[in-house]
């Protein structure tokens, strides 16, 4: 089982063993895909390699997808169409983000979304991260107010 913590300092474990990716963009791709579930290759390139030309961005994305596959030991992300990347629904994933947003588990929120996580020179990712962090914090505060 893949366990991913995103609602505090992020962490990833696979069958209880901590997972460490060799570069931050691999972590970022995993986190983004867990939130979005599917994205076009162009969207991912624009998000993580916005300063690269298209060919270099595509090469970097392929390399990062391979790195995720190698590190996780399987196809967590699939590309059913040449232009699309999706999370493989056959994987068993426990993620605090899903518990909070989809299952309404108030206790899953233990801190800011991807607290302390950053990717150098990925301004689009940073913007997405800030928007998502703010949205989740507002949801948390709203639920907290409902309990009062």
Identify the role of each PLM range.
Residues 32-44:
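Short capping segments at the starts of secondary-structure elements
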Residues 43, 60, 99:
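Ca2+-coordinating acidic residues in Ca2+-binding motifs
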Residues 43-52:
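DNA-recognition alpha helix
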Residues 6-18:
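Short, Lys/Arg-enriched N-terminal segment that forms or immediately precedes the first helix
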Residues 22-31, 54-73:
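DNA-recognition element of transcription regulators
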Residues 17-21, 25-27, 35, 52-56, ...:
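Intrinsically disordered, charged and Pro/Gly-enriched terminal/linker segments
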Residues 1-5, 61-90:
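DNA-binding patch around the recognition helix
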């Amino acid at each position: 089982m893949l366990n991913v913590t995103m609602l505090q300092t992020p962490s990833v474990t696979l069958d209880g063993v901590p997972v460490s990716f060799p570069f931050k963009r691999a972590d970022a791709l995993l986190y983004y895909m867990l939130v979005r579930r599917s994205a076009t290759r162009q969207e991912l390139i624009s998000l993580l390699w916005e300063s690269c030309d298209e060919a270099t961005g595509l090469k970097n994305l392929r390399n990062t997808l391979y790195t995720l596959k190698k590190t996780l030991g399987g196809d967590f992300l699939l590309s059913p169409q040449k232009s699309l990347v999706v999370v493989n629904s056959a994987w068993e994933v426990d993620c605090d983000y899903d518990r909070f947003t989809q299952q309404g588990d108030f206790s899953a929120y233990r801190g800011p979304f991807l607290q302390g996580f950053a990717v150098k020179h990925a301004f689009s990712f940073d913007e997405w991260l800030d928007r998502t962090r703010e949205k989740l914090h507002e949801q948390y505060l709203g639920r907290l107010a409902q309990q009062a």
